Amino acid sequence: MNYFAVALGGFFGAIAREITGRALGTSIFPVGTLAINLSGSFLLLFFMTLFLERINVSDPVRLGLTSGFLGAYTTFSTMTKEIYLLLFQSKLLIGFAYLFLSLSGGFLSGILGRALALYLVNLNFRKNGAKDEG
C-alpha cells in the first residue's frame, strides 16, 4: 500500500512540477525550478511538522504526500543540471547566484513552513483549550 501511495503521489507531483515550470516560463535564470524547489521545501516541512505535532495520518497518506508528491515535485537533479549549464556557458555570476539562492532559499523556506505549521498548531491548541475551560 505504501508503494502505491508513493507512486500515486509521484504521478501527481511530476504533473504539478511540469505545469508550474511551464507557467513560470524560461529565461536565462531558472526561475521555474527555483520556485518549485523553494515551495517544495516550504511544503515538506510544513506538512511534516503538522504530521508530527498535531495531525495523525496513516503511513500511505504521509508517504504519498511527502516522498511521492513533493519528492516528484521538487527536482534536485534539474537544479544541478541548470547550474552546470550556466557555469559551462561562463555565466558564473548567475550560476553561483542560483546555487546560493537554491540552497539558502530552500533552507529558509523549510524554516518558514515549519514556523507556520507550529503557529497554526499552537493557534488551534489555544482555541480548543479556551473552549474546554469555558
UniProtKB/Swiss-Prot annotation:
One of its GO terms (cellular component) is plasma membrane. Fluoride-specific ion channel. Important for reducing fluoride concentration in the cell, thus reducing its toxicity. GO terms for biological process: cellular detoxification of fluoride. It catalyses: fluoride(in) = fluoride(out). It holds the Pfam family CRCB. Its main location: membrane. Na(+) binds at G71, T74. InterPro entries: FluC. Keywords: Cell membrane, Ion channel, Ion transport, Membrane, Metal-binding, Sodium, Transmembrane, Transmembrane helix, Transport. It is found in: Cell membrane. The chain crosses the membrane at residues 1-21, 28-48, 68-88, 92-112. It comes from Carboxydothermus hydrogenoformans (strain ATCC BAA-161 / DSM 6008 / Z-2901). Belongs to the fluoride channel Fluc/FEX (TC 1.A.43) family. It is a multi-pass membrane protein. Na(+) is not transported, but it plays an essential structural role and its presence is essential for fluoride channel function. GO terms for molecular function: fluoride channel activity; metal ion binding. This is Fluoride-specific ion channel FluC 2. It comes from the Bacteria.
